């Protein structure tokens, strides 16, 4: 295999990796999976590659499988041979890049998972509404934190990076999965 294979779904987290593959000029094939929350078939098809049946799932040119968007981001930067998308080790921007990459995927990203379908996590309708409101308030706090740390014109100041792909994508994920399905 000389190309990557990205398993994804339009509007889901795989779009982060799809955008990076495109930006870095890395060749790949895209395999769309069904809605993994609604399709047993989709989960079964993806499970041999990713036991959690989540996207993004990326098969590398050598056949190895990667999951977790932050890890994939770092791998793609290394594999591309470019140092303009992810600050390389030793670059003064590297520590802040890593901090905010992990912040986005560990803190902000999950708020979309919870807010898209709160009743997946809380069955009682009243409790689901309260949960959804709490997640929304927390997401706003997280985005204010990101905004306060952002440079200009890009997150790291004069340097465009993968963080800008994450932020640009994630700030446009509303109104949620139902909208993307249309």
Model-derived regions, located:
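GST-like domain detector, emphasizing the conserved glutathione-binding G-site
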Residues: 1-130
């Amino acid at each position: 295999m000389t190309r990557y294979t990205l398993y994804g779904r339009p509007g889901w987290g795989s779009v982060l990796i799809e955008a990076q593959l495109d930006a870095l000029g890395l060749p790949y094939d895209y395999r769309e999976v069904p809605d993994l929350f609604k399709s047993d078939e989709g989960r079964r098809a993806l499970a041999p590659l990713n036991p959690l049946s989540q996207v993004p799932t990326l098969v590398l040119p050598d056949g190895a499988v990667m999951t977790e968007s932050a890890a994939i981001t770092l791998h793609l930067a290394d594999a591309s041979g470019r140092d303009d998308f992810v600050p390389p080790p030793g670059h003064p921007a590297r520590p802040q890049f890593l901090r905010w990459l992990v912040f986005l995927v560990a803190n902000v990203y999950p708020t979309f998972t919870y807010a898209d379908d709160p009743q997946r996590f809380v069955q009682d309708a009243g409790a689901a509404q309260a949960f959804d409101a709490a997640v929304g308030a927390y997401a706003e706090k997280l985005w204010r934190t990101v905004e306060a740390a952002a440079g200009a014109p890009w997150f790291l100041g004069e340097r465009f990076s993968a963080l800008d792909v994450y932020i640009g994508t994630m700030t446009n994920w509303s109104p949620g999965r139902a909208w993307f399905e249309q």
